[in-house]
Amino acid sequence: MNILIINAGSSSLKYQLMDPETGVVSAKGLCERIGIDGRLNHKVGENKVVKDIPMPTHSEAIAATLEILVDPVNGVIKSVDEIDAVGHRVLHGGMEFFDSCIINDEVIKAIKKCIPLGPLHNPANLMGIEACQKVMPTTPQVAVFDTAFHMTMPPKAYRYAIPTEYYENDSIRRYGFHGTSHKYVARRTAELVGKKEFKMVNCHLGNGSSMSAVKDGKCMDTTMGLTPLAGVPMGTRSGDIDAAVVQFICNKYGMSVDECLNMLNKKSGMLAISGVSSDFRDLEDGAKNGNADCALARDKFCYEVAKYVGAYAAALNGIDVLTFTAGVGENDTAVRAAVCEYLGFMGVKIDPELNSKRGKEMMISTPDSKVQVWVVPTNEELMIAQDTAELVNAAK
């Protein structure tokens, strides 16, 4: 089975052609500078092709993608008919979507309804969907929402303690993000530990970071909120702060609310504390060379991650498994070690030699650790492909 996975941005479109059963990616690429001049970056194995192709809209980007996929020299299929379905990543499903779904007119209307919650991403995601419908009208399309996995949270976890009318009229509540990654890791961890009923905390740590408390495969709580700004501090995002900070800064420095939020999203986090970089590798190098601010940034990050693990362990009445995923979680051995050191009171013990390995799926805890600690490399595209295949096969 061939699933085409689409992740559409405002001026870009990423794609992969994948077998959902094996996870084998036969081709992948990026259409960039859509609406400007257009460029296609296509990769099959180690072979790369770059072409300048006019792409006034996402429709031309999809057409260029399909054309190169069936190209006699650079393609991997003979006909577009060999694509069984298309899976679209959609950022925000609001309170409309609790799971992935086959796209129809009603689904498109509901995604549009969620635009106020995802004003930057949802319109672009819709452009990708509508472009595929135009170019591939008979191929099933599936929407996979970044928020859907977290929709199993109970009200005590997702409701904000603000007047009810804002929830009822404007759907203001905790939603959470990185849901496709959290879902993949939860499902994969169940396979690794050999059972479906267990309690875990997953740490998706990268330039953007979020954590989730998961019980028996279902999300009970997550760190991000109405937007991805909440939770632990990130590469350039502040994470949790006192909401009154916004008013204080706006009043003192004459900023608009939008300018202040831009600062909190793009100029804060590790970049702000270190004064050097948002990249954890740069912070590690800086700390090793005696830069106290780089060391503080990393210490702050590990402290906040460990604090949330402790909070979620309390919320779940204990945990069986702790998982690390995404760029930092999979590769930054010092971050994993520091987080787990905080959790010694929970009986968490990791093997330094096992933890020294980067980017590999493996258990890094010791045999006598009371909590299994795993590194589980994420694969959001495979999760999208599997969701798409399951829905399309069920509809046959």
Segments the model singles out, each with a brief description of its role:
Residues N262, G269-I273, F280-A315:
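Adenine-nucleotide phosphate-binding core of ATP-dependent small-molecule kinases
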Residues L69, V73-H121, V142, F149-A157:
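Short beta-strand-loop/turn "lid" adjacent to the catalytic site in phosphate-handling enzymes
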Residues K215, M220-S256, N262, A326-K357:
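Catalytic phosphate/nucleotide-handling subdomain of diverse soluble enzymes
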